[in-house]
Regions:
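Structural recognition of the conserved hydrophobic beta-strand(s) that form the central parallel beta-sheet
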Residues: 98, 134-141
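Conserved P-loop NTPase "ATPase switch" module shared by AAA+ and STAND
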Residues: 91-113
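Conserved P-loop NTPase catalytic core
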Residues: 145-189, 193, 197
């Protein structure tokens, strides 16, 4: 879940050949952040309630923090936001959160509004207006929900497959990638570019 201390050479190889590696600020940002990756579906599938899921996320990330930063005098090891803030206050290394399938609870528990609200409260408390956050990136199918007066987590820019501006050039497949995939799977490029026809 937490990437810290990966060798500089490994991280350079990770980005080798990508456009980002040629950016003037690439070196400036390399190895400057703690990265926490969470796949929320993995946590949800191992628990019965939202409270259990949040507790498991807290336990897992907390354990990673304790392993990476054992020398810190943590205020309260049971409160994730306190632990993250303690790490940031001691080392001044901000966190990047990558949260995959952030919306899994909305898809699997559609009618459980109380659980959904608790989950949004957890995310808001974890991410919104926190000095330890450099960036949070969440993937999912559904847009970020708002509940009446409950502002939830309204600090995100939302991009979709149908409206990816201004990052559209970085999403989907380039023509060259489509050609390579067609060659790899022995498909006709003409066949791929034709719209799908459905039987009536």
């Amino acid at each position: 879940r937490m990437s810290r201390g990966l060798g500089d050479v490994y991280k350079r190889q990770l980005f080798q050949g990508l456009k980002i590696a040629t950016h003037p600020d690439f070196e400036k940002h390399l190895n400057q952040y703690n990265v926490i990756h969470l796949n929320m579906q993995n946590f949800l599938s191992k628990t019965q309630t939202i409270e259990q899921m949040i507790a498991l996320v807290t336990k897992a990330v907390g354990r990673d923090l304790l392993r990476a930063y054992p020398d810190i005098d943590y205020l309260d090891k049971s409160i994730l936001t306190f632990m993250l803030d303690d790490v940031y206050q001691n080392y001044q290394v901000p966190f990047i959160f990558i949260i995959d399938e952030w919306d899994c609870i909305f898809r699997s528990r559609k009618n459980q509004l109380e659980e959904q609200t608790k989950y949004l409260d957890f995310l808001r408390d974890l991410l919104k207006d926190k000095g330890y956050i450099a960036l949070a990136y969440m993937t999912g199918i559904l847009p970020i929900k708002k509940y009446g007066e409950h502002s939830a987590i309204n600090v995100f820019y939302e991009y979709s497959m149908t409206d990816a501006s201004p990052i559209e050039e970085f999403t989907g497949f380039t023509e060259q990638e489509v050609r390579q995939l067609c060659e790899q799977y022995n498909l006709s490029l003409i066949h791929i570019s034709e719209p799908t026809r459905h039987a009536q």
